[in-house]
């Protein structure tokens, strides 16, 4: 059994894709937590709980921001590895999400070093819905990619007969 550089790339990508799936699942859980915190009518009228809700939103947004750049870098590494391994079909499948990540990164708010997920704007229902839909779409993409990479690991490993 001989491993090629492409097989190594697929194996590494398989492991990193699993970590991206966990990142995105955490995003979905965090957005759902923000949504339920936003919709709870009993807690909306409680002023003593308001400060705690604001701190919770700030904490969640801070944690979300810490996962954005690693996600973008890992996906950029995928594209770089597939380009070096001359896996053009796989690179072509990953390029649209890479361009979206670049667009999203370069169109972040200009008022600071924060990439996105501002505590004030995230509580806007439209922005929260957009972020949640984006997370579900990314989860679908990463899950499909995971199984594609799993298939390609087996397809790129060549068995050498004796």
Curated annotation (Swiss-Prot):
GO terms for biological process: synaptic transmission, glutamatergic; vesicle-mediated transport. One of its GO terms (cellular component) is synapse. Residues 1-10, 94-138 are cytoplasmic. It is found in: Membrane. The keyword Transmembrane helix applies. InterPro entries: Cornichon. Keywords: Membrane, Transmembrane, Transmembrane helix. Residues 32-72, 162 are lumenal. The keyword Transmembrane helix applies. It is a multi-pass membrane protein. Its main location: membrane. One of its GO terms (molecular function) is signaling receptor binding. The chain crosses the membrane at residues 11-31, 73-93, 139-161. Pfam families: Cornichon. It comes from the Eukaryota. Regulates the trafficking and gating properties of AMPA-selective glutamate receptors (AMPARs). Belongs to the cornichon family. PANTHER family: CORNICHON-RELATED. This is Protein cornichon homolog 2. It comes from Xenopus laevis.
């Amino acid at each position: 059994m001989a491993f090629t550089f492409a097989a190594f790339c697929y194996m590494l990508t398989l492991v990193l894709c699993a970590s991206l799936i966990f990142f995105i699942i955490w995003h979905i859980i965090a957005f759902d937590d923000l949504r339920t915190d936003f919709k709870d009518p009993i807690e909306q009228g409680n002023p003593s709980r308001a400060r705690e809700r604001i701190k919770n939103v700030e904490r969640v947004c801070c944690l979300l921001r810490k996962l954005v750049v690693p996600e973008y870098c890992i996906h950029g590494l995928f594209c770089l590895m597939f380009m070096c391994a001359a896996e053009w079909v796989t690179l072509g499948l990953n390029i649209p999400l890479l361009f979206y990540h670049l667009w999203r990164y370069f169109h972040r708010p200009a008022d600071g070093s924060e990439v996105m997920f501002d505590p004030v704007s995230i509580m806007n229902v439209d922005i929260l819905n957009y972020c949640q839909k984006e997370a579900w779409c990314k989860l679908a993409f990463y899950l499909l990619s995971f199984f594609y990479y799993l298939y390609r690991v087996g397809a790129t490993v060549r068995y050498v007969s004796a």
